[in-house]
Amino acid sequence: MNKQGNTYTFLYSVVLVVVVAALLSIVSLSLQPRQNENRENEKRQNILSAIHISSTAENSAELFGKYIKEQFIVNTQGEKIEGNAFNVNIEKQYNLPVEKRELPVFVADVDGATKYILPIYGAGLWGPIWGYISLDDNKNTVYGTFFDHQGETPGLGAEITTPKFNEEFRNKQIFSGNQLVGIEVIKGGNATGANQVDAISGGTITSKGVESMIKNYLTYYEPFLKQR
């Protein structure tokens, strides 16, 4: 075959593309277990953060097993359903009709006190925001939160990840009597109510996104939260 001809060049290019694609596929498959492990460790760390437990990729599995005593899924009627709570993808659930969503519940024991940890997901200014909120045994008082985001503005909306902002939610109440009210994020440093926290300066839209995210997801969990 003429190595200077178009046919040779074409066949050579095809073979090269196939070989490179095969190598990339092999590399991707070999890395997948490690990538899955990293995602699971990060998820454990985030859940633990909502109950004020610091962890690393190296010890997150151990600490998760130490503090998380039970995990299960409920539906929007508050009924337990079959499934693995840890494996539920909240981002995918967010796009399903509400009545079809699976709602994970993680039950922790912190110094002998029961805490309920619930995942939450919503929209910020520039993209999705998500996190976890933990409640005391009364399913009303906030024990802790963890928030993260995809693309909020550094120094503004991205401040939802800071300990300062998260600490504001501690000991706030999500119910007023028997009515679910969520947590109101107030602009201007005027948060004095039992269910109010201060908004991030310059990050009003993201702050309101956090407020909506918490209220919406707690509404899905409301039948479960009202079980005593």
Please place each PLM-identified region on the residue numbering.
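Flexible, solvent-exposed loop/hinge segments and secondary-structure transition points
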Residues: 2-228
